[in-house]
Design a protein with these regions (language model features):
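Negatively charged
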Residues: 2-194
Length: 194
């Protein structure tokens, strides 16, 4: 029997290449995301220990709120399993450099997308560059889309396919974006709430 430390480096590196980070809680995931986003050196060390962020297994996570909020981040996470996530509140808030595809995420269980791509304002007048298709998203369970794309000035993708019949809050959903208001059926009940 070999101890891992007594194996040749080539074998250890091969074993590590199969390691996939599988966080059990939001706290675990948030901690490693923070390590990933500190700087390039930290990203390299985090990649060595946890594997590349694009390969992380997020199937156990139900809450991704604030996950990348205020971080400098633009890596591919399109293959993340988000099918159990219910909360994406402020997930990419103030992540001004993020512009990666997310169109094939299964967001069918998400109820909260409040400020998901929101960009804060201030003396620097920064704006999000996010402009990726999201037309394949099933948002039929979302209740809150308040400020979802507010400040995402580049976002101009069609969302006409979205079923927003359960949304109760769309305040400033497209504030300061160039997005045309989608052709959605919105009930009088929803208009009264908006």
């Amino acid at each position: 029997m070999y101890l891992l430390t007594s194996l040749p480096d080539a074998i250890i590196n091969k074993i590590k290449s199969y390691v996939v980070f599988c966080p059990m809680t939001k706290k675990n995931l948030k901690y490693v995301v923070a390590l990933w986003c500190i700087n390039e050196n930290s990203k390299i060390e985090t990649c060595k220990k946890y594997g590349h962020i694009s390969l992380w297994n997020t199937e156990n996570i139900t809450d991704m709120s604030y996950l990348f909020s205020n971080f400098r981040f633009n890596d591919d996470i399109s293959k993340w399993n988000v099918s159990n996530v219910t909360n994406m509140n402020r997930m990419f808030r103030s992540t001004k450099s993020f512009n990666q595809p997310l169109n094939y995420w299964d967001v069918s269980n998400v109820t909260n997308m409040n400020s998901m791509f929101y960009m804060t304002f201030g003396k620097y007048k920064a704006h999000s560059i996010f402009n990726q298709p999201l037309d394949k998203w099933n948002v039929s369970n979302v209740i809150n889309m308040n400020d979802m794309f507010c400040g995402a000035k580049k976002f101009n993708q069609s969302l006409n396919n979205w079923n927003v019949s359960n949304v109760r809050n769309m305040d400033r959903m497209f504030g300061l974006s160039i997005q045309q208001v989608p052709k959605w059926y919105i009930s009088k009940k929803q208009i009264d709430i908006i």
